[in-house]
A protein has these predicted regions:
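Arg/Lys-rich, positively charged N-terminal/basic patches that mediate binding to nucleic acids
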Residues: 1-38
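Solvent-exposed interaction patches of small proteins and small membrane subunits
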Residues: 6, 27, 31-37, 54-63, ...
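A broad, structure-centric signal for solvent-exposed, well-ordered loop/edge residues
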Residues: 8, 12-14, 42, 53, ...
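Short amphipathic alpha-helical interaction/hinge segments
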Residues: 19, 26, 47-54, 98
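Solvent-exposed, amphipathic alpha-helical segments
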Residues: 21, 42-45
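Basic/aromatic recognition patch in beta-strand/loop cores that engages polyanionic ligands
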Residues: 45-85
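Enriched for short, Lys/Arg-rich terminal
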Residues: 71-75, 79-113
């Protein structure tokens, strides 16, 4: 069975922001194109193998329903919804992706100390 890929507006905005930062702030348009294309390409496997990505667990070990695939220092975070893979967000591995996904959760991180 092949799954349909659906990109959220937030994911597309994240991708734009990542590319914009690399191109403008880091003055590297070639890297911006390579990184944003690589993040998109990392989701291609999900059409046939949506369970490829690692699961994201909430504190206490509860499955959040999200998974992620990686490209270099970036995560493409997604959910499997019946016959669809919903690509929710793209984040740098240095970001607190739990707070990006669950801003309402009181999650204590090492940065809070």
């Amino acid at each position: 069975m092949k799954y349909k890929i659906n990109y959220s507006p937030e994911f597309l905005n994240d991708l734009f922001q990542i590319g914009d930062y690399i191109e403008i702030q880091l003055h590297n348009p070639a890297a911006a194109d390579r990184i944003t294309s690589g993040i998109m390409d990392s989701t291609d496997i999900l059409v046939e193998y949506p369970e490829t990505g690692a699961k994201i667990f909430l504190p206490g070990g509860l499955d959040s329903g999200y998974r992620f695939v990686t490209f270099e220092d970036y995560l493409a975070i997604y959910q499997i919804r019946f016959n669809e893979v919903y690509i929710a967000r793209a984040v740098n591995v240095r970001q607190d992706y739990m707070r990006v996904l669950f801003p309402w959760l009181q999650i204590r991180s090492d940065h809070d100390e």
